[in-house]
Regions:
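Residues that form ligand- and interface-recognition hot spots within folded domains
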Residues: 8-9, 13, 38, 118, ...
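Terminal C-lobe "cap" of eukaryotic-type protein kinase domains
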Residues: 110-138
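Structural signal for hydrophobic/aromatic residues that build the beta-strand cores
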Residues: 2-7, 34, 53, 57, ...
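Conserved C-lobe activation region of Hanks-type protein kinase-like domains
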Residues: 19, 26, 30, 36-99
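Short, amphipathic alpha-helical segments that act as regulatory/interfacial helices
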Residues: 54, 58-61, 106, 110, ...
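Long, extramembranous regulatory segments enriched in acidic
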Residues: 51, 143-145
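Conserved C-terminal C-lobe helix
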Residues: 97-108
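Activation segment/activation loop of eukaryotic-type protein kinase catalytic domains
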Residues: 1-32
């Protein structure tokens, strides 16, 4: 089990609502894991943390994300290309090779309104439904099989 919390870039919810776009000038956190809404400077909410978690889980399994090797003449152009890659990458393709619940988790996160309080119990149960499936990289045996 991994618990990773970074409150260094957290923003408070004001009266239960996400912050406004004018409250910040750039993407919060690493662009590689940031939600599409974060990169578009839209109001952030819990769903953005969950979308970032989904990208982190895919990265932990694969060791890279489809946009990990994106390059461009400027950082701004690179960030735009990464955002576009995320917007066009279907959860089923991004999560290919992972248990089906990962793609569904990402789909639900992306569809959630920014201000909505997630049903954490349901999301946890969704991911737990596939917890018994070993995560394997193509062509590699799991440590327990050696």
């Amino acid at each position: 089990m991994v618990h990773c919390i970074d409150f260094g870039m957290s923003l408070p919810l004001h009266k239960g609502k996400a912050e406004t776009p004018s409250a910040r000038r750039g993407t919060l956190g690493a662009v590689r894991y940031a939600s599409v809404s974060n990169q578009m400077l839209l109001p952030l909410g819990p769903r953005d943390d969950l979308e970032a978690l989904a990208y982190s889980l895919v990265y932990l399994h694969r060791g890279q994300l489809p946009w990990s090797q994106v390059s461009a003449p400027t950082q701004r152009e690179k960030f735009v290309l990464i955002r576009q890659a995320k917007q066009h990458e279907e959860p089923q393709l991004l999560c290919a090779g992972l248990p089906p619940s990962f793609a569904e988790f990402l789909r639900l996160c992306r569809a959630m309104p920014a201000h909505e309080q997630p049903d954490y119990a349901a999301l946890r149960a969704l991911l737990a439904s596939d917890a018994h499936r070993p995560l394997r990289k193509k062509g590699r045996r799991h440590d327990s099989e050696r």
